Swiss-Prot record:
Disulfide bonds join C297-C443. This is Periplasmic oligopeptide-binding protein OppA. Disruption phenotype: Mutant cannot take up cell wall peptides. Accommodates the ligand side chains in large hydrated pockets which impose little specificity on binding. Tight binding is achieved by utilising the hydrogen-bonding potential of the main chain of the ligand. Its main location: periplasm. Residues 1-26 form the signal peptide. One of its GO terms (cellular component) is outer membrane-bounded periplasmic space. SUPFAM superfamilies: Periplasmic binding protein-like II. It comes from Salmonella typhimurium (strain LT2 / SGSC1412 / ATCC 700720). GO terms for molecular function: peptide transmembrane transporter activity. Isothermal titration calorimetric measurements of the binding of lysine-containing peptides of different lengths to OppA show that the dipeptide Lys-Lys is bound with 60-fold lower affinity than related tri- and tetrapeptides (Lys-Lys-Lys and Lys-Lys-Lys-Ala, respectively). GO terms for biological process: peptide transport; protein transport. The gene is oppA. PANTHER family: PERIPLASMIC BINDING COMPONENT OF ABC TRANSPORTER, PERIPLASMIC OLIGOPEPTIDE-BINDING PROTEIN-RELATED.
Length: 543
């Protein structure tokens, strides 16, 4: 939205969010395209999901499935813009009180209506410490009234600033104005969950026989570590525009296996990590099937800021400086990613970042400064720094970890032991803080700097670097005290500078989204930098 439009609406006291003239996106099949008789899609999802409960998930694999099973107030269109989901329209007063008008024909897969009461229950459940959601802090990012006290256990979840004005009107009250609040509502964690099923079946409510969904698809079959199969939900409000009848998600963690099964015809769409050793070959052999698109993600190494010796900023800074990003990006990976100097990608909406001075240095100068800092911290050739580098099971992450360990050894003289864990164990280890340095990646939940920066707040449930900085926390809090976009961007830049000063993480590269897509998969655009793919927008062309 332009500043002119925004200012005029602020003057009126009400901002009506960007709403498409038509209903939310669905499969748009061009005239003349012949559809296949069999409308089924097979996607690789990168790993076994952590859960199918929207309040128990935090990774990309889980979000991919959740988008098809559950629909929140808003969804993304094919270019990544927030669009109507269960809410067909909404407005706000001074960016602080937001009112969402729900579709009267929105239903659960059991035929019961989706109501504002479902959202009240679901958001209270997400906030409740007893749920132990890894995304409880997401409601803090939206500054919903009373969320801080609820997470701290000082108030009950029922005090959350949400209410049902009637069955189809949902009101959210924030503790302070948040102009971009509506952007947060695309994320799966704020989708509704079915109260009756949750209360009846407890932790088993997501099993195929028990689950009730409100998205375009429902769960047909789930064989752990083998496949998740979804089928069309005939109760979905926009089911008439859905084309694909069944989608299968495979938990293949090996990028090479992913490509091999794609080329054998078993998979229609690979995961968004391409094998390093096959990428250039694939570009030559099947160029029309190799998709390389923008992706709002940062690949980095997460340092345990609370664990000695990594609680010494000199050690963290030495690791940051001595990593040769050009080798990683241009020689090891070579897929078009960009060397990173920050946590927030500089092309994020509202980001006006300043390159740090060290990023302008030669690698030789960075290495010299890194060795000096490490020596000051007490580590020398006779007493080298030795630590474990943790990564989740993946061909790509393993190759990068090997390369990074070698670079740090050469440039800094440190000894790195590599350790890998399966996805769910890996996430638990990081949350518990029982690691030295870990491979990490963050992909934006919405296109705004706080989608990255909020995760580094001292009290964030996403803060697995265990970084604590009152100065950083204050800068983020101050962003909500300014109405001017330019001033807000300046504060975001200062927050990034604080992260850099503290060397909270080791940024490696800003991602591109590289995957293989069969030519008969219609509706895939690759234009959404958040990579929010909804299978209801896709279709299979006759081939």
């Amino acid at each position: 939205m332009s500043n002119i439009t925004k200012k005029s609406l602020i003057a009126a006291g009400i901002l009506t969010a960007l709403i498409a003239a038509s209903a939310a996106t669905a499969a748009d099949v061009p005239a003349g395209v012949q559809l296949a008789d069999k409308q089924t899609l097979v996607r690789n999802n990168g790993s076994e999901v952590q859960s199918l409960d929207p309040h128990k998930i935090e990774g990309v694999p889980e979000s991919n499935v959740s988008r098809d099973l559950f629909e929140g107030l808003l969804i993304s269109d094919v270019e990544g813009h927030p669009s109507p989901g269960v809410a067909e329209k909404w407005e706000n007063k001074d960016f602080k009180v937001w009112t969402f008008h729900l579709r009267e024909n929105a239903k659960w897969s059991d035929g019961t209506p989706v109501t504002a009461h479902d959202f009240v229950y679901s958001w209270q459940r997400l906030a409740d410490p007893n749920t132990a959601s890894p995304y409880a802090s997401y409601l803090q990012y939206g500054h919903i009234a009373n969320i801080d006290d609820i997470i701290a256990g000082k108030k009950p979840a029922t005090d959350l600033g949400v209410k049902a004005l009637d069955d189809h009107t949902f009101e959210v009250t924030l503790s302070e104005p948040v102009p971009y609040f509506y952007k947060l509502l695309v994320h799966p964690s704020v989708s509704p969950v079915p109260k009756s099923a949750v209360e009846k079946f407890g932790d088993k409510w997501t099993q195929p026989a028990n689950i009730v969904t409100n998205g375009a698809y429902k769960l047909k079959n789930w064989v752990v570590n083998e496949r998740i199969v979804l089928e069309r939900n005939p109760q979905y409000w926009d089911n008439a525009k859905t084309v694909i009848n069944q989608v299968t998600y495979l938990p293949i963690s090996s990028e090479v296996t992913d490509v091999n099964r794609y080329r054998s015809g078993e998979i229609d769409m690979t995961y968004n990590n391409m094998p390093i050793e096959l990428f250039q070959k694939l570009k030559k052999e099947i160029p029309n099937e190799v998709r390389v698109d923008p992706y709002l993600c940062t690949y980095y190494y997460e340092i345990n800021n609370q664990k000695a010796p990594f609680n010494d900023v000199r050690v963290r800074t030495a690791l940051k400086l001595a990593l040769d990003r050009d080798i990683i990006v241009n020689k090891v990976k070579n897929q078009g990613d960009l060397p990173a100097y920050s946590y927030t990608p500089p092309y994020t909406d509202g980001a006006k970042l300043v390159e740090p001075e060290w990023f302008k240095w030669s690698q030789q100068k960075r290495n010299e400064e890194a060795k000096k800092l490490l020596a000051e911290a007490g580590f020398t050739a006779d007493k080298p720094l030795t630590f474990d580098l943790l990564y989740n099971t993946s061909d790509l992450h393993k190759k990068l970890a090997i390369a990074v360990a070698s670079i740090w050894k050469k440039n800094l003289g440190v000894n790195v032991n590599l350790e890998n864990q399966e996805w769910k164990t890996f996430l638990d280890t990081r949350h518990q803080g029982t690691f030295d340095v870990a491979r990490a990646g963050w992909c934006a939940d919405y296109n705004e700097p706080t989608s990255f920066l909020n995760t580094m707040l001292s009290d964030s449930s996403n803060n697995t670097a265990h970084y604590k900085s009152p100065a950083f926390d204050k800068l983020i809090a101050d962003t909500l005290k300014v109405a001017d976009d330019t001033q807000r961007s300046e504060l975001y830049a200062k927050a990034e500078q604080q992260l850099d000063k503290d060397s909270a993480i080791v940024p490696v590269y800003y991602y591109v989204n590289a995957r293989l897509v069969k030519p008969w998969v219609g509706g895939y655009t690759g234009k959404d930098p958040l990579d929010n793919i909804y299978v209801k927008n896709l279709y299979i062309i006759k081939h």
